[in-house]
């Protein structure tokens, strides 16, 4: 069962408990994409058989750095089909072939790193590792609810706030005001993170009503 912890277009948070329960009834594995969650919403990778996560979203790292986690149950059943030299038990003995001994751990799924991306990722991930992500979520989703209140729409309790904007009129107003937002699946999508505050909520409201 493959799902995104946070849906990209709407910011809706998946009901992980229900998904895990349904998967267990059918003896199915679960794979959770945490790309739209890690860095703003607490994520416990131990709940799932696999998680995948790119770091260029809420973790604010350069493109090219990503993570995979595997449960012991799933790890025991998987073998990479196109393993590169970095998946070898001894990477420096795995450069030229023709034979290679795969790493016995999940490192056998590693690929050759995008070196420059990981230099940047080390700094940003280090920053987030020192934060209380529950507090980050409380702050970001609180700003999202403040925007909902100001716009007169139901609170969504999310860091990503979205509403119907099929014509793109609202998005155009925000862009014209110098506010970065996006249009996804016929909806306007606005989000809040560490560097946002109440003044940003007011800026969005002013631009939409101007």
Where are these regions (language model features)?
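PLP-dependent enzyme catalytic core of the Aspartate aminotransferase-like
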Residues: 173-210
